[in-house]
Structure formats: C-alpha cells, structure tokens
C-alpha cells in the first residue's frame, strides 16, 4: 500500500526463462561446441544460441558462458517428453527470445545483480530477464536504476530473503526520468557495460574472450605482465564504482 504510484511492472515485463529439464542434454559451455554452429547473429539460424543462466553476483555485463541447443527454433526442447508423453521442458515467454533486455542473478546472499542481456540470447529460469512492454524502452537506464542502492533497498524491503522473484521486481516504484537526467545516467550505464566487456575480453570462459593478458600486456617479465593486467582491471572496476 505504500507504493501507490507507478511501478516497474507497468513499463517492463519481468519474464521467467525456460526450463529445459535436462541441461546435460541441451546446455553446453560455449567452448564445448562446434564453433561453426555457434550463433552470433539473430539471422544466422545456427544450432547453439547464447544462454543467460544467472551465475554468481556480477553487475553490468558478464556470466556469458553457456549456450543452448535451439536448432530448428528449439524443436528438440519443445518436444522433450517423458515415457508417458508428458511434457518435461517449459518454454516460457518465447515472444521475448532474442531481444535485448536486462538479466539478473536472482538468488544469492549478496542480493540480486543486474546485467545487460544481449540481443540474440535466450534465457534460463535461473537467468530471468526484464523486457520493455511499453513505449519506454531504455534498457541502459533500467540497468543503471536496478543496480542502485535504492533499488537494492526496496527489493530487500519487499522480500528480505536470498531470492528475488519476478513479482518483487514488478512492484518496485519507477518514474520515467526527465530527458536530461536520463541521458546522463544512460551514458554512464553504457560506459560501465563497456568497461566490464573490456575485462571479460581477458577471461577465457566469456564468449567475448579475445586473448590472454599475458600476450596483450607488454611487461618485460611474467610478473610485470600480471601486475599490468591487475592494474588495468582495478582501474576499470574503480571507474565502474565512480560512475
């Protein structure tokens, strides 16, 4: 009753992801699959789509290391039944598949953490997402708002447990900002995403991994290379906090 004004759920739909019911069969780490069948674009119709699946506490960007078998528009998953013919898998909110949004880790002692959910990704029940359902479609501002201490405090008041539900997110009070403030916040949010992407580019388990920091950083010794990388990562993370 305290939240009488408009809520987040009026502008964005908190969507629960799919449950394959057999991840050993349908889900892989991206480095385990034939790279020629790894989808990089919506139009390519390749077998393995990137799969937002939650993961450890991590803000802005990352935890992109799993892929799911979506060959023939997910035919195998959609027709996965038990011996009696009863449906085992649950393909939920398919209308939002492959759209950009905001994904989050819903369970953890540190609370929820929110990250960019790139277009061309699918999402798991453990990596549920928020998608625009109105004329307001600024995912950058939404991401910044949800990663604030204010949003964290409100979620903790609504549900003081280690699990954040779709209903909790929908109830958060939300006001569309004035354009000038929205632009500033969105730019800082996008900057944070770029900084986290730069860090992920040196993490071998992330899909945007490019090269080892031991190759890129030009220290004269192994110790110097490691120290240069740690300085780079610390600088990026410090800027994220300042933003």
Each PLM stretch: what is its role?
Residues 49-51:
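Hydrophobic/aromatic-rich, well-ordered segments within soluble, folded domains that form packed cores
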Residues 3-11, 16-44, 53-58, 65, ...:
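S-adenosyl-L-methionine
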